């Protein structure tokens, strides 16, 4: 470690100990050096002993800064790593930090655009509209009068991220050596997944492309509106998009005051999620309340507004089909089908004992279904499923973890808006219709239509391909026949060699025995030994 890393590590240890996080260290023989080391750092007492452990962990991560805040937010979705009380506290982490100087933002914009800011924008507000750990947002107008927001990456964030990521990897590499269950948790993979997410958020060109894709997917939809992005003004560290006005989705009082149809709004949240996942295979992966607003227009026919598209997820056709069938099998309590789907999809190893897996799923999930369907959480069903599957060596599926996190957000918001929301009743027709569309006659006809141009292109080559196929088959058959003959000859030679080896060994033993007995047989022992040697040589040559 270089001096800077050691200093940062000392600071991190100091913050963690000041919140008493040494309580998270398990009391095992492997962790004895860590616990002894804690006792040596007597000048770093627990200053928050009156608080619960989960709250202390959340406060410590907030104090450590942006990289650790976002890491805690990601860990809140991995409920196989922590008890529910701690995971719930991590989910409360707020991605809000002190803004950086607006003059720095102005200088960054001018550097990115290559000209004075006034060349492109009017009414630039140096005071930020919002500030988060990765970037902050300023308002302005384009020269045509269009109100926009300008998102600017923090100027000092990249060196901080790189330094803290190096420390995270180092700490993660220690976990398997310190915890009995450390290898199963795959700590290095967790950090790797986090680093990828974080680096994606640092590239605003990626976020701009995501927003453009989502806007196109929901163009003209009454359910969701994505603000327009202006690509000509965007770079890796700066993004310009349309300014929107709406009610924060978690401001229930304001929504009710304007007469919003809360039942329809809650149901549309579910429909938006399943449309993104199953129709578009492209979903907003950070749909927490801070990124979702409700339009002021048409409260009786409410429309969501989505921003901050830095994190998105996608599922391939196989994952979508297995996921949809899993949901339906789950709510039909067909646990055998759920277990088989996991094996068929490759999410768990092919040698998994299906009966044991089915029993484990039944044990965990059957108590959930004692509740009325309207009270059952899709997200927690998925969470229990993944946690059970991990005990059967399910590989970490980043796209499914992100989907589960997003589903929990959607459920939480939906039930906050309309507590009687029946998620299953809203989602089941959508899932059943999607499966029927994917597996019925329309799906076959659609596949034929998609493949038709390719087949038409290859049709003139078909006679030649058939001829080449027959020719290759003939050549292969000749090779097989020749190989069969060679194997038979080799087998005969091996049999003869074994026979000659046996004769040679017998003659040598008899000749040696007669010679050691001193029998008066003249030159017979020598002749026997010579014959045995010749037999060995002939047998050896046949094997060569």
Swiss-Prot record:
Phylogenetic classification of the source organism: Bacteria, Pseudomonadati, Pseudomonadota, Gammaproteobacteria, Enterobacterales
Domain of life: Bacteria
Function, in words: Is probably a protein kinase regulator of UbiI activity which is involved in aerobic coenzyme Q (ubiquinone) biosynthesis.
Similarity comment text for this entry: Belongs to the ABC1 family. UbiB subfamily.
Domain Protein kinase span(s) in chain numbering: 123-500
Topology in membrane: Multi-pass membrane protein
Record-given protein name: Probable protein kinase UbiB
Swiss-Prot/TrEMBL keywords: ATP-binding, Cell inner membrane, Cell membrane, Kinase, Membrane, Nucleotide-binding, Transferase, Transmembrane, Transmembrane helix, Ubiquinone biosynthesis
Residues at the active site: 286 (proton acceptor)
InterPro entries: ABC1_dom, Kinase-like_dom_sf, UbiB, UbiB_bact, UbiB_kinase
Cellular component GO terms held in the UniProt record: plasma membrane
Subcellular location(s) per record: Cell inner membrane
Pfam (any one): ABC1
Biological source species: Sodalis glossinidius (strain morsitans)
Keyword Mitochondrion in record: no
Record EC number: 2.7.-.-
GO MF annotation list: ATP binding; protein kinase activity
